[in-house]
Amino acid sequence: MTKEQIIGALKEMSVLELNEVVKACEEEFGVSAAAPVAVVGGAAAGAAAEEKSEFDVVLTNAGANKIKVIKAVRELTGLGLKEAKEIVDGAPKTLKEAVAKEEAEDMKAKLAEVGAEVELK
């Protein structure tokens, strides 16, 4: 049987039949059909496998009530009035980077309360 004949036979099979063929090949030859995964590095590989635990809090739009948003940004970041105003006026801007999920969601909720649009990345 040639490769073309084998491929032709595989094209005519259903997904269930193909799955059975793959399992039979794995058993027969002692191999796995799983794609090989490149080893990136201990920390990076572990972080990719887990659910994302750190987020960047990004102010995407200040909304209509900029004064309240500026006050909220000052409160959440500890910045001065001038710096907070520059961030709000220059949206989209990152407010905080690598923040724990719970803190990021809390920041997002507080900013949304005063009319700002916030993204967690």
Swiss-Prot record:
GO terms for cellular component: cytosolic large ribosomal subunit. CDD domains: Ribosomal_L7_L12. Disulfide bonds: none annotated. GO terms for molecular function: mRNA binding; structural constituent of ribosome. GO terms for biological process: translation. Keywords: Ribonucleoprotein, Ribosomal protein. The keyword Ribosomal protein applies. Belongs to the bacterial ribosomal protein bL12 family. Forms part of the ribosomal stalk which helps the ribosome interact with GTP-bound translation factors. Is thus essential for accurate translation. Homodimer. Part of the ribosomal stalk of the 50S ribosomal subunit. Forms a multimeric L10(L12)X complex, where L10 forms an elongated spine to which 2 to 4 L12 dimers bind in a sequential fashion. Binds GTP-bound translation factors. HAMAP family: Ribosomal_bL12 (MF_00368). This is Large ribosomal subunit protein bL12. It comes from Clostridium perfringens (strain 13 / Type A). The lineage of its organism: Bacteria, Bacillati, Bacillota, Clostridia, Eubacteriales. The gene is rplL.
